[in-house]
From Swiss-Prot:
Protein name: Uncharacterized protein C9orf40
Biased composition (Pro residues): 97-106
Presence of the UniProt keyword Protease in the record: no
Modified residues (Phosphoserine): S69, S76
Keywords on record: Phosphoprotein
Source organism per UniProt: Homo sapiens (Human)
Bias (Low complexity) ranges: 107-116
Record-linked InterPro entries: C9orf40-like (IPR042349), WRNPLPNID (IPR033461)
Biased composition (Gly residues): 117-128
Region (Disordered): 45-138
Length: 194
């Protein structure tokens, strides 16, 4: 059995990558569309600066002291505070002010408080199970009836009616006895015909 290349199992199911895996010895590779002249810098390089390696060299000094640059110090250059204390208005490591808490997003059956127009939105509450709610504090945290009626395919469905198990048991017993009687009668008719 022939050995496979490492890229083949990953890319062979993609049609346009199959061509990359095939070896075309008959045709030479097309020339690049644009060849950079030797004096022109690439997009991230300054003019007149010789091209350096892309990867940053890491030495032991920068790894030992991560906050060496003044722009990354927590105290913005003020070293009068002890190192154990942190200012409350700054973030943990970056020195940025803390972000405001994210807004509370409503569940799938609810709306944002400012999403409705002041005039009522124009639909007059059509398609709602209950009256429109005015307070969003406690009601948005509780699971409402519309949330539980929303299925996984994100289509609305009608709620199922309550089912009495006694009715199902009675129906299943009646149909079983009728089916067994019909099965016995059909078996007798088949025997008589042959």
């Amino acid at each position: 059995m022939a050995k496979r290349r490492a890229a083949e199992p990953v890319t062979f199911h993609v049609p346009w990558k199959r061509l990359l895996l095939c070896d075309f010895a008959e045709q030479p590779p097309p020339p690049p569309l644009w060849i950079r002249p030797p004096g022109v810098a690439h997009a991230g390089q300054l003019l007149g600066v010789p091209e350096q390696h892309r990867k940053r060299k890491i030495d032991a000094g920068t790894m030992a002291e991560p906050s060496a640059s003044p722009s990354k110090r927590r105290d913005s250059g003020d070293n009068s505070a002890p190192s154990g204390q942190e200012r409350e208005d700054h973030g943990l490591e970056t020195g940025d002010p803390p972000l405001p808490p994210p807004p509370v997003l409503p569940g799938p059956g609810e709306e944002l408080p400012g999403a409705r127009l002041p005039g009522g939105g124009g639909d007059d509450g059509a398609g709602r199970a209950g009256p429109p709610r005015g307070d969003w504090g406690v009601a948005s945290r509780q699971h409402n009836e519309e949330f539980w009626q929303y299925n996984t395919f994100q289509y609305w469905r009608n709620p199922l009616p309550p089912i009495d198990l006694a009715d199902i048991e009675d129906l299943s017993e009646d149909t079983l006895t009728e089916a067994t009687l019909q099965g016995r009668n059909e078996g007798a008719e088949v025997d008589m015909e042959s």
